[in-house]
Amino acid sequence: MADIPPDPPALNTTPANHAPPSPPPGSRKRRRPVLPSSSESEGKPDTESESSSTESSEDEAGDLRGGRRRSPRELGGRYFLDLSAESTTGTESEGTGPSDDDDDDASDGWLVDTPPRKSKRPRINLRLTSSPDRRAGVVFPEVWRSDRPIRAAQPQAPASLPGIAHAHRRSARQAQMRSGAAWTLDLHYIRQCVNQLFRILRAAPNPPGSANRLRHLVRDCYLMGYCRTRLGPRTWGRLLQISGGTWDVRLRNAIREVEAHFEPAAEPVCELPCLNARRYGPECDVGNLETNGGSTSDDEISDATDSDDTLASHSDTEGGPSPAGRENPESASGGAIAARLECEFGTFDWTSEEGSQPWLSAVVADTSSAERSGLPAPGACRATEAPEREDGCRKMRFPAACPYPCGHTFLRP
């Protein structure tokens, strides 16, 4: 607490004995003057008290008439600068008895009429702990800092999902198969690969024919192994459309290592020329190829002929290879026509709802446009709207069988 002396003019105009000290700025405490006791009133003359009271009242009246307010400096007040707030860390010592300020006020002739003070929270001195913390921008109270080192937050492993675990096991198994020298049969891996190929072939122009081709391939590979008919390493390279490079070397090494563990059967078949096709070899590994563009060679068979009927016919003749002229030309042509019709009408949706499929105008009469209001009939041959029958069908140009797709049409056998 620092005392600032008042101005000299204020000392000259106001008596020192009767200038009450000003309370601290911002405090709203009601003060009342101390009533003199009987002994003091008898010792002091009445004239002195009356003269001092008149002088102070005249000064206050003059200040009010002038329209200005006396500053604390002119009133002989004191400025308070609390420097103990930044150094104290404990509770302030607040007693129930009168404090030093109260003694000063009482000695100056004033008594402070204030309510009892409440207990305050302990003040915490905020300080920066050390230079590394300051460089890192860490600001926190020193009393909260513990001596134990802060543990580094360890990242928790994500919860393992069934699909992720399954993919991890599959990738580990594939890596083991690649790195392992000995070949082992893995039926689960073969099943997954075949299933993936079936899913890829769903985007083909003819998914059923492509799927049947894959079935033929897996079946022929099994029968070739069952009959102990083996191919040479170079023949396998031509069959898998790899010529030279890392894949060719790996394929030859794997085949030779497996053949060394078994007794040699017949001589390997090596008479397999390269496929005379427009897309062969490395071009098969390039995406976005035209599947329907250009003319194909004789070796490329249409997917339309690979139907379920042809698969069954091939399975019936598994005993031995059939000669080239064994098939009847008429049956072959009839099978091609049947396969073509099956390809065209295989995806035909036979539903009983009107307007569900774009029906052919040559087979089924179009009634949706005639039912629209405000549109005239496009031709005289179109039948006018007839009353509905009990079964919900309409009587049209075909009296024998109603072509409306309700399940009783001539298109359904």
From Swiss-Prot:
Pathway: Protein modification; protein ubiquitination. Residues 297-309 have a biased composition (Acidic residues). It is found in: Host nucleus. Tyrosine phosphorylated. One of its GO terms (biological process) is symbiont-mediated suppression of host JAK-STAT cascade via inhibition of STAT2 activity. Keywords: Early protein, Host nucleus, Host-virus interaction, Inhibition of host innate immune response by virus, Inhibition of host interferon signaling pathway by virus, Inhibition of host STAT1 by virus, Inhibition of host STAT2 by virus, Interferon antiviral system evasion, Phosphoprotein, Transcription, Transcription regulation, Ubl conjugation pathway, Viral immunoevasion. Residues 84-97 have a biased composition (Low complexity). It holds the Pfam family Herpes_IE68. The modification Phosphotyrosine is found at Y189. Residues 1-124, 289-334, 370-390 are annotated as: Disordered. The keyword Transcription regulation applies. Functions as an E3 ubiquitin ligase and plays a role in the inhibition of innate immunity by preventing IFN-mediated signaling. Induces the ubiquitination and degradation of host STAT1, STAT2 and IRF9, resulting in the blockade of ISGF3 nuclear translocation. This is E3 ubiquitin ligase ICP22. It comes from Human herpesvirus 2 (strain HG52). The lineage of its organism: Viruses, Duplodnaviria, Heunggongvirae, Peploviricota, Herviviricetes.
